[in-house]
């Protein structure tokens, strides 16, 4: 299950509710660690459900979230800054692909990649590996360049592999 602490929601308006959901990470830096709860978020409107993973290691919470919400239209998923030593707080690309499938996402936009590298992998490895891991999944992998618009409802929109 998701635990009572995560059964929080904020009704922003009649057309937007934000749900606070689990993630597997930590909060803070230095001596002020874990004084706040880390989390992921589901944005629910009458038209669609958009999930934002935040930083998270892979875990059963993704499947539980997918089951609770009956899938998601768009999942914005962490995909980068991973290392075997950080596996409990940052997903490797194959785990991002599986977490997206666990959510029953229709479309996935990877985040946390293609910019400054804090881990030992190359800047483009997260996208290369996620593209490979997503080939047999039931979601559309959307990989816009920085600033490129994404039309969530347009199932014909395609993006070039700009990281190659």
Show the residue positions of the predicted features.
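Short, small-residue-biased leader/transition segments that mark boundaries at the very start
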Residues: 1-6
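Cap/insert and terminal regions of metallo-dependent hydrolase folds
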Residues: 57-146
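Core dinuclear metal-dependent hydrolase active-site scaffold
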Residues: 7-70, 146-164
